[in-house]
Swiss-Prot record:
Keywords: Cell cycle, Cell division, Chromosome partition, Cyclin, Cytoplasm, Meiosis, Nucleus. GO terms for biological process: cell division; chromosome segregation; G1/S transition of mitotic cell cycle; positive regulation of meiotic DNA double-strand break formation involved in reciprocal meiotic recombination; regulation of meiotic cell cycle phase transition; signaling. Pfam families: Cyclin_N. InterPro entries: Cyclin-like_dom (IPR013763), Cyclin-like_sf (IPR036915), Cyclin_N (IPR006671). Residues 61-183 form the Cyclin N-terminal domain. Belongs to the cyclin family. Cyclin AB subfamily. The gene is crs1. GO terms for cellular component: cyclin-dependent protein kinase holoenzyme complex; cytoplasm; cytosol; meiotic spindle pole body; microtubule organizing center; nucleoplasm; nucleus. This is Meiosis-specific cyclin crs1. The keyword Transmembrane helix does not apply. Has a role in meiotic chromosome segregation. It is found in: Cytoplasm; Nucleus. The keyword Methyltransferase does not apply. It comes from Schizosaccharomyces pombe (strain 972 / ATCC 24843).
Amino acid sequence: MLTSKHEFSLFLNTPAINSKSEKEVISEGPLTTSNEIDVTFSESFSSHLINLRRVPSVNSIIEQEKKGLTKISPSILNQNIAYKEKRQQLFSVLYEETVGYVSMDTLCIAISLLDRCFTVKPTIPTTSFKIYAIGCLFIAFKLTSDYSVAKKSFCENLAPSLSTKNLEKYEKIVLALLNFDIYVISLPSVESFLTPLIFQHVFFKSLPSESCDQMMVEWQYLLVEVMKDCQFIEYRPTEILCASFWVLLEIIWPSAFDFKPFQHLCSLPTNGSADETYIKHSNRFHDLIISIQRIADMLA
């Protein structure tokens, strides 16, 4: 639950007090390396990823992601330094201080809606960040809940000084700005679909359960750091998931896995390997890997 001091630091330009959440404590520590693996496992896993790309649902997800990217402008958002700082601070505080109340899916949808708001209207003053942040978060709660979100409970848990009347006002401001176009396919929702498919491979079933658990913790920690950073908003969720998972495997088992099958899994439809779209995506995926590797290096 956010206390009043956290609310103040979020929305009124006061530096947040550093604290470590339970999630950070669990995930803290260097990404570890392991012994070499059999090349047969590597080749088999590569084939597994290539086959997953043929799953109709994967293609449907990628098409939805493409549409989502058309609703934001990475260049506009990354040029807005004040917005980038407040966005990262909002993500960090909600992630660290609202465990059990704000799900990761809700958080990511709220951030995506906020990105859309500041794309549609880049001139939103810094002093109005609170209005759009709260409005987007309340809408995200509604989108991810199977029940009506109680306005009073929302305010008590996330913005104690806010009245339910103003909460309704903030929600309407966001809805009007976005013309009620609020559908978001979030990274957590894609991850919940894609990860079980990836882990169906016999390679992961052959690992001790504690190794898989640790791998998931380290992957989550890496993903959280990526999602905080505004530089990654130009990438689709499947791209981030595939690139970050390859980076993690590369750290644990250096040079054991080819990155191309991971690239293929998140690739846009093309007419062949020489197609211009394929080449563009290859360069894009390579750049993404390098950026994520930098973050992994800082976490090590």
